[in-house]
Regions:
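Mid-to-C-terminal alpha-helical segments outside catalytic/metal-binding sites
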Residues: 4-35, 42-95, 99-106, 115, ...
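Active-site gating/metal-coordination segments in enzymes
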Residues: 15, 19, 23, 114-200
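Conserved, mostly hydrophobic/aromatic
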Residues: 36, 108, 157, 180, ...
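Histidine-centered divalent metal-coordination motifs
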Residues: 36-42, 190, 233
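Short aromatic-enriched loop/helix-cap "lid" or pocket-rim segments at secondary-structure transitions
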Residues: 43-49, 142-143, 199-202, 241-244, ...
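Acidic-and-aromatic substrate-binding clefts and catalytic sites of carbohydrate-active enzymes
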Residues: 94-98, 135-141, 163-171, 237-240, ...
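A structural motif corresponding to the C-terminal end of an alpha-helix
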Residues: 106-116, 123, 219-229
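Catalytic pocket-lining loop regions of alpha/beta-barrel enzymes
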Residues: 155-156, 169-282
Length: 324
């Protein structure tokens, strides 16, 4: 974890770094790319919130905020249905409250975020646009649209098998992934078994949580080991998935698997850098579900003794993937 440090100065006791690039990182301000964010209402009601003033609600139970306040010391997703219902409600309210362009810009400003990966357009220059597949279209039309999106500036592909109701092992997913994989562009997907709607919701059957199971992502990586694939949330938010993901990566010798830090504490972030490699870890928050501030603090704590590695995780690794 301290690869870049070459020793300590004879008189100063300060870390000594080998290259001018490494020295320069010590002198510059913190650079941050948030590799996992959302703008607008991503759920089935699709409320028109992006260009409206930020909404505010009376205080409500918010497990996302509680988790951040506790420094991500436990899993986000539990098997307790009552707790899951509270989480689902909070996720919808946070989307409406913090998912507008105005609220997003405020969060970027307050947390000094240089860029954030999201699905939308270039109206905010700090938002780096990814696109997603329109699985309603026939495969040839879907692929043609994705190619047009790339020409218009899409820097990668985002998949959400639960909310899109299409597993990662579906032929339509393969077709979309191949468009980006063959061009060397990154492909990220939600991973994790979690409900987005409470029991009885008319939308719950349209968002099967089992499509977030890790084995779907592992099958996709095995099919396309040469593509840049990024399992979000380090495989999931139940607390154990990142270890299973890392075991598979090492067992098969997959060289192009990256992952992100969303909802992970400093200890787990250090583990992720060791398990996947310091060049394969991307800072991410899953904003607006996380408020950014505590995620930044956790990442700073994780790599406080290695500013070069901190810059890689916060900025450099993502910048290389996105050709910035």
């Amino acid at each position: 974890m301290r690869r870049v440090q070459r020793g300590r100065g004879l008189f100063t006791g300060c870390p000594v770094y080998e290259t001018m690039e490494e020295r320069g990182i010590l002198d510059m301000k913190r650079r941050i790319i948030d590799f996992h964010t959302h703008l607008g209402d991503i759920f089935h009601d699709s409320r028109n919130i992006v260009f409206h003033p930020q909404l505010h609600f009376p205080p409500y139970p918010d497990p996302f905020e509680d988790l951040a306040r506790d420094h991500y010391s436990r899993a986000l997703v539990t098997e307790n249905q009552e707790e899951q219902n509270i989480l689902i409600d909070a996720g919808q309210l946070r989307t409406w409250e913090y998912g507008s362009l105005e609220a997003t810009q405020k969060a970027l400003d307050e947390n000094h975020i240089d860029y954030a990966v999201s699905l939308p357009s270039k109206l905010e220059p700090r938002l780096l646009p990814f696109t997603s597949a329109d699985f309603r279209l026939p495969i040839p039309e879907m692929k043609a649209k994705l190619k047009r999106d790339i020409i218009r500036g899409a820097k990668g592909l985002k998949l959400h098998p639960i909310l899109q109701n299409v597993p990662l092992t579906d032929e339509r997913t393969y077709a979309a992934v191949e468009v980006f994989g063959e061009m060397g562009l990154p492909i990220t997907s939600h991973c994790g078994i979690n409900d987005y709607y409470k029991p009885g919701s008319k939308y719950q059957p349209l968002a099967p949580k089992e499509y977030g199971e890790l084995h779907y992502m592992l099958a996709l990586i095995e099919r396309y080991p040469d593509y840049i694939l990024i399992p979000a949330h380090a495989g999931g938010d139940c607390g154990w998935e990142y270890e299973e993901l890392a075991q598979a990566v090492h067992k098969h010798g997959w060289k192009n698997v990256y992952t992100d830090t969303s909802f992970k504490n400093a200890k787990v972030m250090r583990e992720l850098a060791g398990l996947f490699g310091e060049d394969k870890l991307l800072f991410a928050t899953d904003y607006p579900f996380d408020g950014i501030t505590q995620s930044v603090a956790a990442c700073e704590e994780a790599f406080a003794d290695d500013p070069v590695l901190a810059d890689k995780v916060f900025y450099g690794n993502a910048a290389k993937l996105l050709h910035l």
